[in-house]
């Protein structure tokens, strides 16, 4: 027998084995199925209990995604739940972002690699203590005004466009396609907002168009009749999950849940089991007892119910993306902290060596039999110590340098920040009025959210604008302005801060800036000039120190309160005149010797007032120790570097008199108390 004949015989012998292997592989792929039957979740033919937790990719630096997921897995979780914020992925119309913090596909694939399942909450509304509930703020500029979270045709067309980009990206990652996604949530707690079922039906139609019929769609609503009646759509075969206070008896609520699911399709699921709670500025930090939280979870898991911890790991509201809440009216406004620690078992900086993590971990093991993995190592943190800062410039000195001339606008009436294209941060409004001999009364009936008011003489005045006071959304809307005895008109400067858009409730259409007329002694001011304050290039702020070496004439060109006919005194005189009540930029530096010395740290702002901070051009968020409770901002190690590290601070009022900050190891939520 020749060599070729032997090879043919070998192929004949191996062919049945190859066919069998292919068949087995195909069968295995086909068996990848997740569904609900007999009021039980099933995965690949076996009953399955969801032990999940929310871990939001957009609240964690991407370098830490794997670390946080591993800590969630060591807690005993088999499933990760996350929102998808539209405003991060489409910050401008048709401008799509899916890199870095927004690389959701990489995050989902990473969960899959770690053998974790995913429940994906695609919105379009997410709530989540996130700016505008995840909606892009440019939606607020559309005319005629659209109605969010409704069957408004313009709104639906934009949702369709957004999902037409997002859903094809996640379709290959569905469980039936070999990926980790077992469930996809539409909307979020809609039953506590409205009852537009046509809107919900449309969302289901779009989701099915891109994701097919095999994926389990679900809704989440509060465990009360009214919420479930308004927010569920069982006729579309959409699974209804519930959330409720951890102090509640879960099983009567799970029984109510059955009434809003098809018969046999109501596996008990709390899709938001609250491990802690949110905190607003001016409140004490919210905490919950570890033992009582663990007991509440045990009541669900030990009776084969399913639960998703909200949050398993909270993370951080970096940048300007924190949300806010309102009460009985839109003036009853409270903004969320930069920290989204949430008193979750995995702390903001990843710590798991705490009572809550250990208590929940024991309960999960006891009730489900999920093996206990080795407890993750402690997170290394560093105290880099005291850092001296120097004042770089007053905002008024450099407004023309950090305000895009093409975006400066003139209008008879003040324009909203959104209409100015300034979606986040700050906007400076300027106008003039004729002064009386006595003081005047300034009135701004509607400002969102916080305005600092300054005045100066329009001509012949080389001094900085004089600080008058604050007008806040939640308090008095009037200010008394003292007489300046000007020979000319008085220039009025109003710096407005967008502190975060409302993310929940009836006042979610939350435009920012001055949203009413402005009056002086009952007379409406007109002829406004608006300067968007761009903080995108704070890394170049040191260059603004060149202003200090400019000639008087050059300085007059860049000063908002100078005119070309007036010679200003050397700007350095003002930059070194000491501590004053004005918005200004400060800069500090600290050195890290090597890559191995890079550690997580916190910047303590005790002694400072209110503002926003950047580390190596990364916006680590807002600080407001004057009212607390958060004193220190989290700085994850990946944004640091060996060598020189630069901290830029935009302080709205006055800095620590010693012009120092401190880099410390631990978080601190004791300010303002």
UniProtKB/Swiss-Prot annotation:
Question: In the record, what terms sit under GO molecular function?
Answer: beta-galactosidase activity
Mind telling me which InterPro entries this protein's record contains? B-gal_1-like, BetaGal1-like_ABD1, BetaGal_gal-bd, Galactose-bd-like_sf, Gly_Hdrlase_35_cat, Glyco_hydro_35_CS, Glycoside_Hdrlase_35, Glycoside_hydrolase_SF
Q: Which GO terms describe its biological process?
A: galactose catabolic process
Which EC numbers does the record give? 3.2.1.23
Q: Which residues form the active site?
A: 189, 272
Note the SUPFAM superfamilies from the entry.
(Trans)glycosidases (SSF51445), Galactose-binding domain-like (SSF49785)
Question: Which compartments is it annotated to reside in?
Answer: Secreted, Extracellular space, Apoplast
Q: What superkingdom does the record give?
A: Eukaryota
| UniProtKB keywords | Apoplast, Glycoprotein, Glycosidase, Hydrolase, Secreted, Signal
Which class of enzymes does this protein belong to? hydrolase
The UniProt record lists the keyword 4Fe-4S: no
Q: Extract one GO cellular component term from the record.
A: apoplast
Pfam name, any one? BetaGal_gal-bd
Attached carbohydrates are found at 38, 230, 304, 329, 401, 489, 540
Signal sequence span is 1-20
**Catalytic activity, as annotated:** Hydrolysis of terminal non-reducing beta-D-galactose residues in beta-D-galactosides
Keyword Electron transport assigned: no
Family, as annotated: Belongs to the glycosyl hydrolase 35 family.
State the name under which the record lists this protein: Beta-galactosidase 8
